[in-house]
Amino acid sequence: MQPNDITFFQRFQDDILAGRKTITIRDESESHFKTGDVLRVGRFEDDGYFCTIEVTATSTVTLDTLTEKHAEQENMTLTELKKVIADIYPGQTQFYVIEFKCL
């Protein structure tokens, strides 16, 4: 079995597969992905593979510079997005936006 390159919480799987979630915001430990990378995607909870994505763009962002567009690309409100990011990465402020499409 091939290892997954990136994982997402299971609660995001349906939005990714439906094309409603088209970015992910990560910390420095996952800042190495580049435009054009093709990644196997698994669920964080059980590492089960569920799709393959292609990275279409990357950029940096801070918690304070997150926008409504980021929230729309994450399929949530800006308030929800800031809370999710703060819950996943407490105390951090610098993040990496990975834009992607399902293949």
Swiss-Prot record:
Q: Return one Gene Ontology term, BP aspect.
A: pyrimidine nucleoside catabolic process
> What does gene deletion cause?
The mutant lacking the yqfB gene retains the ability to grow, albeit poorly, on N(4)-acetylcytosine as a source of uracil.
Q: How does activity depend on pH?
A: Optimum pH is 8.0.
Provide the function of this protein. Answer: Catalyzes the hydrolysis of N(4)-acetylcytidine (ac4C). Can also hydrolyze N(4)-acetyl-2'-deoxycytidine and N(4)-acetylcytosine with lower efficiency. Has weaker activity towards a wide range of structurally different N(4)-acylated cytosines and cytidines.
> Which Gene3D superfamilies does its entry note?
Hypothetical protein (2.30.130.30)
* EC number in record: 3.5.1.135
What does the subunit comment say?
A: Monomer.
CDD domains, per database record:
ASCH_yqfb_like
Q: Which NCBIfam families match?
A: PRK04980.1
Entry annotated with the keyword Hydrolase: yes
Give the protein family: Belongs to the N(4)-acetylcytidine amidohydrolase family.
Quote the catalytic residue positions: 21 (proton acceptor), 24 (nucleophile), 74 (proton donor)
Q: What is this protein called?
A: N(4)-acetylcytidine amidohydrolase
Q: Which GO terms describe its cellular component?
A: cytosol
Regulation of this protein's activity per its record:
Unaffected by known inhibitors of amidohydrolases: PMSF, p-hydroxymercuribenzoate, p-chloromercuribenzoate and EDTA.
Which UniProt keywords are listed?
Answer: Hydrolase
User: What are the temperature characteristics of this protein's activity?
Assistant: Optimum temperature is below 20 degrees Celsius.
Q: Where is the ASCH domain?
A: 6-101
Q: What is the effect of changing residue 21 to A?
A: Loss of activity
Catalytic activity entry: N(4)-acetylcytidine + H2O = cytidine + acetate + H(+); N(4)-acetyl-2'-deoxycytidine + H2O = 2'-deoxycytidine + acetate + H(+); N(4)-acetylcytosine + H2O = cytosine + acetate + H(+)
SMART domains on file: ASCH (SM01022)
InterPro entries named in the record: AC4CH, ASCH_domain, PUA-like_sf
Q: Which domain of life is it from?
A: Bacteria
Coiled coil ranges: none
Matches recorded under SUPFAM superfamilies: PUA domain-like
Query: What GO molecular function annotation could you give as one example from this UniProt entry?
Result: hydrolase activity, acting on carbon-nitrogen (but not peptide) bonds, in linear amidines
